[in-house]
């Protein structure tokens, strides 16, 4: 399958491409797409930047997948992936080959960096991103269009709803349920359930406000 990557910004994706190609020699990565017109026809660490989302429809086929690399905003990631699917593109997983996914369930369009740990009986939806050294404890359920930042620790039997953003080094204690489109601040320690749209910071985590979002869920297809 040919895999096109959307978002020519993070050089770590180049190392992931090389790792995937070492483990799967027939994996093809023709280049990147980026909506910044200044990047069109430029070079990103040896890979061409071909254009923006407008090219998806012309490239879409059964043997072509698209990877959304947007991670800074779960809302932007959700909307961009919806546009890819609406244009006829199919989302592909971009997962570092060192990650053990046995005894887990994972959807499509997910982006998991090196050193992510996914324990047994974890379920992950679609269009979710996890950065380096995040740990997802056993029997946890992670929704769609979720972002898990570097060094986040999600304990066993937790639930994280669609569209939720979990900041760097946050800790989610066992059996905690976090709703949809919530925001967990960097370094927060979440000790109890969090409702939809809540913003949580501190240790122990406390709700400081709510942000209304116009989405029921984070599903993209």
Where do the protein language model's features map onto the residues?
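Structural signal for interior beta-strand "rungs" in well-ordered beta-sheet cores
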Residues: 94-201, 205-208
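A short, Lys/Arg-enriched amphipathic alpha-helix followed by its capping loop at the start of a domain
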Residues: 19-26
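Short hydrophobic segments within beta-strands
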Residues: 5-7, 33, 69
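Glycine-rich adenosine-cofactor-binding loop
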Residues: 1-19
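Short active-site oxyanion
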Residues: 2-4, 29-30, 63-66
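NAD(P)-binding Rossmann-fold cofactor-contacting core
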Residues: 26-43
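…primarily DNA-binding HTH/wHTH and HhH modules…
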Residues: 201-221
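Phosphate-bearing ligand-interacting subdomains
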Residues: 38-100
């Amino acid at each position: 399958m040919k895999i096109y990557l959307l978002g020519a910004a993070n050089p770590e994706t180049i190392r992931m491409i090389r790792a995937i190609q070492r483990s799967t020699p027939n994996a093809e990565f023709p280049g990147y797409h980026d909506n910044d017109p200044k990047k069109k026809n430029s070079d990103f660490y040896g890979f061409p930047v071909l254009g923006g989302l407008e090219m998806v429809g012309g490239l879409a086929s059964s043997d072509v997948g698209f990877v959304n690399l947007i991670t800074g905003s779960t809302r932007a990631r959700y909307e961009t992936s919806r546009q890819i699917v609406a244009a006829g593109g199919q989302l592909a997983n971009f997962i570092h080959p060192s990650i053990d996914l046995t005894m887990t369930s994972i959807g499509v369009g997910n982006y998991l960096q090196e050193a992510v740990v996914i324990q047994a009986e974890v379920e992950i939806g679609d269009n979710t991103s996890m950065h380096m050294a995040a740990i997802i404890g056993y029997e946890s359920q992670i929704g769609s269009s979720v972002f898990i930042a570097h060094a986040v620790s999600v304990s066993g039997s937790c639930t994280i709803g669609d569209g939720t953003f979990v900041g760097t080094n946050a800790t989610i204690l066992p059996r905690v349920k976090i709703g949809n489109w919530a925001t967990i601040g960097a370094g927060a320690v979440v000790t109890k359930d969090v409702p939809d749209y809540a913003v949580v910071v501190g240790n122990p985590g406390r709700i400081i406000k709510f942000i209304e979002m116009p989405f029921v869920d984070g599903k993209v297809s």
